Design a protein with these regions (language model features):
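Mobile active-site "lid"/loop adjacent to the S-adenosyl-L-methionine
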Residues: 293-323
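Conserved SAM-binding loop of SAM-dependent methyltransferases across substrates and taxa
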Residues: 233-246
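S-adenosyl-L-methionine
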Residues: 256-297
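Non-catalytic substrate-recognition/targeting regions of SAM-dependent transferases
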Residues: 107-120, 136-207, 215
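Non-catalytic accessory regions of SAM-dependent methyltransferases
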Residues: 1-121
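Conserved class I S-adenosyl-L-methionine
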Residues: 223-232
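C-terminal catalytic and target-recognition region of SAM-dependent MTase-like enzymes
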Residues: 333-395
Length: 395
């Protein structure tokens, strides 16, 4: 008889699971039975042999990512049910059913009770990204569930996990199409068109999580002179142009990002002379710019991906925000963000507070921003709340 692949917890270490937290850390494990390989589904038992969860096992600090707290098989029907539940939430909240929007996140990891899995929808293409070996091993079942749930609306499924999986010599994690391949890379977000580069772009090709914040920015753009730092695809710039900005300057250190921004401007506002893009380091640009702008967006990449880099990240946020607050015109509005999971809302707000004091400007908070509804936060997994932003009025 084959021994069940299972994890036995140390005494008392089931408490976080009883509160439905989806991670089991390696230090909580008494022993592992059945010789599971990385990415296998294991059954988790308390020290007195009570069933408590089932999930993917992986070498590392997070040893098991919980898929279910029910004693149920992890089979094709499981994946079908979970993706159907995720899609139903997007339908009921109006995210996936809008005629002017076919760009959204279908699965957001722990927020959809599928830790280690991201699925973004770009028109007729679904991009699957695994952040755990278990989700990599399950990718074909996940793709089958996508096909079943989205039916005729999805013609292409692209798998993009080369940069998100831990190094393992014995797994093939090459990016590529699971289904289709002759895909248009133009997607629509709230009536605006964007070139999505899921083959070579960051993340799955687009920062879907800023959709509602871009829409808010549009309401402030009319007649303003706008600077979009770390522009990447130019999302904020495109919304600002539609909102009636007088001028829009987009800055990114990557020339590829500038090319993509210019292409997105051209597809929405061909020949619009209000927009100029600069391939330049953000700090260098801020140092040399005059007091030319009254609406600035700071949306940098994650300054800290690990807790040991938190201190340097907070220094970076202070320096960046202080320079922007110093340079923005009186009556200016600053949209400033952090997407670092290890930077808490309190950390970020304190960094911006310190920046305002350094710049010696009177500053008021107009909005406190976060991720949109298609990036839900599991109430039992507060670590999932990673995006934080402030909209500031600078006198």
């Amino acid at each position: 008889m084959t021994m069940e692949k299972s994890v036995i917890l140390k005494r008392g270490k089931e408490e976080s699971l009883q509160r439905f937290h989806p991670w089991i850390f390696s230090g909580a494990i008494q022993r592992i039975d059945g010789k599971p390989e990385e990415g296998d589904v294991v059954t988790v038992y308390t020290n007195d042999n009570r069933f408590i969860a089932r999930g993917h096992i992986q070498v590392g600090s997070i040893a098991v990512r919980v898929l279910t707290f029910k004693d149920e098989p992890i089979d094709q029907e499981f994946w079908n049910r979970r993706l159907a539940t995720a899609y139903d939430m997007r339908e009921r909240t109006g995210i996936s059913s809008r005629e002017d929007n076919n760009t959204y996140r279908l699965v957001h990891g722990e927020g959809d009770n599928l830790p280690g899995l991201i699925i973004d929808i770009y028109g007729e293409t679904a991009v699957i990204q695994a952040h755990s070996v278990g989700m990599h091993v399950s990718r074909m079942q996940i793709a089958e569930a996508v096909k079943k749930i989205l039916k005729e609306t999805i013609k292409n499924i692209y798998y993009k996990s080369e940069t998100t999986l831990p190094y393992k010599a014995d797994i093939n994690k090459d990016n590529g199409y699971i289904m289709g391949g002759n895909a248009s890379n133009i997607s629509t977000e709230y009536g605006l068109k964007f070139h999505i580069d899921w083959l070579r772009g960051q993340k799955t090709g687009f920062f879907v999580d800023q959709r509602e914040n871009r829409s808010l920015l549009e309401k402030y753009a009319k007649g303003r002179k706008l600077l979009n730092m770390f522009c990447y695809t130019g999302g904020f710039s495109i919304y600002a142009l539609r909102g009636g900005a007088e001028i829009v300057h987009s800055v990114d250190s990557s020339s590829k990002a500038i090319d993509l921004t210019n292409a997105n401007v051209e597809i929405n506002f061909p020949g619009d002379t209000r927009h100029t893009a600069y391939a330049e380091d953000a700090f260098d640009f801020l140092d040399r710019m005059g007091n030319n702008y009254n609406l600035i967006i700071l949306d940098p990449p994650a300054f800290a991906k690990h807790r040991d880099s938190l201190r340097n990240a907070l220094i970076g946020y202070r320096r960046l925000n202080a320079k922007a607050i110093e340079k923005i015109q009186p009556g200016g509005i600053l949209f400033t963000f952090s997407c670092s999971q290890v930077v808490s809302k309190e950390n970020f707000r304190t960094a911006v507070f310190t920046a305002a004091a350094m710049a010696k400007r009177n500053v008021r908070i107009l909005h406190q921003l976060t991720q949109p509804a298609d990036h839900p936060v599991n109430i039992y997994h507060p670590e999932g709340e990673y995006l934080k932003g402030l909209v500031l009025y600078v006198e």
